Amino acid sequence: MAHATLPVRTGEKYRAECIRWMTEFKPDLFVTFVFNRGINIDEAQRTFEKFHGYIDRKLIGRAFLRRPDKRSSYIATVEKPDTNIHIHALFRMSDIQKLRFCLIADGIWETLVKGGNLDIQVVHCAEGVADYITKELRPQTSDRLLLPRHAEISSSR
């Protein structure tokens, strides 16, 4: 019986640590990216990363790849990969970037995902949105946790 409860405790501890980490990230925006069509997890991730590149190019300019310190940051999770796949993302950015993001994000997403849609919300309670986007996150589903490539590269230097 003790072995049966161990994975639950480990999963709960993992999720609690993710919630703490996401809360400390201090996100500004909570965005849900909906595909509204069948798509696999790899294609969903590639499309989301493409969106991030497009949005940062609009926010920062053509040299956005050479300016990782100016780029928007996010922590995202892929949810329901076998049925109604969508991505929840917590973004952190400057106030002006946040305003511009809200004005242009829908158009960029519609260009990338015909029939897809976004739900963009200002974060008022980081712990609450972190709790929500981690509801399916466990150690065995940690591959559904997405971070920007520029953050991975700069943290490994």
Predicted segment positions?
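Right-hand nucleic-acid polymerase module
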Residues: M1-I85, M93-R157
